[in-house]
């Protein structure tokens, strides 16, 4: 008899894409997949586009959003838990997988109240508030990076599920210093304003041949393209890169934020990187994500407070002339990557659906 999985993931690509990777793997094995999210975030379009039905609940974040929202939070949470329970009664999943996003909190509580096994996956090196709370209710807690939760019988490090086409990329190769440096700029699914503003001038000031592909985020393409044109730099600018595997394969160096999915894809792709973590990320989780590769010699760390035209230009110029260093960084990235994370998470879903408890796992 076919098993059913309910995936809870939304808000950003860092939550949605790993969930899709697991969903695709289980669907190929005969599972039925449903999704729980919110109607005003990216999962509302992205998940149906991948062929999965999605149900919505009404929920918003409560951290750092003012006293009125904080006071209204208990009512909203209770309402959203009841909505999630109705979804569970309709779908009757064998397992509920929480990948992060606003819907995960109420959905996780509803799963626990309904007696449905709850499996959590924490994508960041620092656990988010929702997963910290839900961990008490979950049968199993999976981590992308060590240290997000204390080691126990119920926890395991499995990596971040990344797109299979990224995992399938060949081993990194040394590029010739006589050729232009292939520079990929990735601001995450929502773009990164500081990269959009600083990189064009830095590329121009580097004083070395550089070819650029720049993912700028929705609504930013025209202004970023104009910034490159003003500096006399030819660049391929796009709001969203559909084929990230091709982009990583092309790149000698990536300059990017340090969201969980980006860090994991950089590692899986085997490409050198300069990480510029989002400075105001909750619990500074992007810095901790970045350090998992920086500490292994696979990437460089550039705090946003130190990011200037001159500082980035100097790094680009230095690395462009040291292709062996870039290759060593790329190889180190591939070495620390966990490339079968989607399979590991899918296997955990199957074990819970089969009735194995945390001690058996």
From Swiss-Prot:
Localization terms from the record: Cell inner membrane
E.C. designation(s): 2.4.1.227
One Pfam family it belongs to: Glyco_tran_28_C
Source taxon at top rank: Bacteria
Annotated positions binding UDP-N-acetyl-alpha-D-glucosamine: 12-14, 124, 163, 189, 241, 260-265, 286
The reaction(s) this protein catalyses: di-trans,octa-cis-undecaprenyl diphospho-N-acetyl-alpha-D-muramoyl-L-alanyl-D-glutamyl-meso-2,6-diaminopimeloyl-D-alanyl-D-alanine + UDP-N-acetyl-alpha-D-glucosamine = di-trans,octa-cis-undecaprenyl diphospho-[N-acetyl-alpha-D-glucosaminyl-(1->4)]-N-acetyl-alpha-D-muramoyl-L-alanyl-D-glutamyl-meso-2,6-diaminopimeloyl-D-alanyl-D-alanine + UDP + H(+)
Keywords from the UniProt entry: Cell cycle, Cell division, Cell inner membrane, Cell membrane, Cell shape, Cell wall biogenesis/degradation, Glycosyltransferase, Membrane, Peptidoglycan synthesis, Transferase
Protein name in the entry: UDP-N-acetylglucosamine--N-acetylmuramyl-(pentapeptide) pyrophosphoryl-undecaprenol N-acetylglucosamine transferase
């Amino acid at each position: 008899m076919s098993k059913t999985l309910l995936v809870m993931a939304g808000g950003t690509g860092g939550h949605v894409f790993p969930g899709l990777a697991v969903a695709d793997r289980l669907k190929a094995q005969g599972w039925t997949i449903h999704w729980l999210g919110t109607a005003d975030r990216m999962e509302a379009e992205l998940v149906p586009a991948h062929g999965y039905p999605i149900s919505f609940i009404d929920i918003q974040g409560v951290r750092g959003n003012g006293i009125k929202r904080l006071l209204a939070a208990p009512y909203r949470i209770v309402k959203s838990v009841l909505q999630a329970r109705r979804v569970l009664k309709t779908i009757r999943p064998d397992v509920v997988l929480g990948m992060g996003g606003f819907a995960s909190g109420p959905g996780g509580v509803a799963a626990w109240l309904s007696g449905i096994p709850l499996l959590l996956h924490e994508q960041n090196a620092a656990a988010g508030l929702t997963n910290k709370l839900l961990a008490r209710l979950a049968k199993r807690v999976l981590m992308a990076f060590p240290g997000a939760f204390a080691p126990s019988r119920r926890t395991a490090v499995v990596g971040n599920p990344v797109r299979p086409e990224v995992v399938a990329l060949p081993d990194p190769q040394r590029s010739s210093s006589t050729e232009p440096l292939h520079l990929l700029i990735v601001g995450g699914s929502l773009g990164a304003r500081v990269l959009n503003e600083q990189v064009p001038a830095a590329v121009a000031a580097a004083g070395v041949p550089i070819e650029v592909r720049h993912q700028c985020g929705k609504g930013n393409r025209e202004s970023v393209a104009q910034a490159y044109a003003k500096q006399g730099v030819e660049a391929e600018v796009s709001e969203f890169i559909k084929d990230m595997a091709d982009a990583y394969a092309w790149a000698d160096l990536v300059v990017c934020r340090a969201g969980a999915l980006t860090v994991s894809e950089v590692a899986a792709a085997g490409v050198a990187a300069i990480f510029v973590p989002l400075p105001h990320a909750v619990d500074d989780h992007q810095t901790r994500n970045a350090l998992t590769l920086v500490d292994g010699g696979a990437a460089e760390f550039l705090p946003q407070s130190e990011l200037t035209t001159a500082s980035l230009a100097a790094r680009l110029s230095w690395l462009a002339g040291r292709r062996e260093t870039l290759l060593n960084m790329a190889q180190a990235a591939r070495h620390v990557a966990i490339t079968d994370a989607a399979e590991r998470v899918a296997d955990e879903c199957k074990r819970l659906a089969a009735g194995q408890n945390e001690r058996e796992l």
